[in-house]
Amino acid sequence: MTSDELLELLNYIQKTKCETKNLEIKAAEYGCPTKLYDTLSGFANQDEGGRIVFGVDEKNDYRECGVYDPQDIQQKINDQCHQMEPVVRPLLTVAEKGGKTFVSAEIPGDDLAVRPCFYQGAGRLTG
């Protein structure tokens, strides 16, 4: 995804004000969500994968709040992706809009041969 595509996706989110089976929205205004594992495994276990957009507050009428620190959140997303089995390799994109910074993580769907993708800390059956 390019920065322009992320900006288009932000506009789409403002129009629809909803998530979909391949789109998850996280505020991340004050820090990176600490447990992305369910979302990461859910998207990795779908053929088409999915996208997580950070910087939109779903609980506040989809307010565009931006992220606290684009460099740090990318590192923390990657750290959580490395705790998955198989390791999730997100495509990260950063875009600016209205003086705020937004980050998206595209999570590719895993091949059937390596599924299920799961959180290593919980194990194959519960992660």
Region locations from a protein language model:
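Conserved N-terminal catalytic/coupling substructures associated with nucleotide/phosphate chemistry
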Residues: 1-127
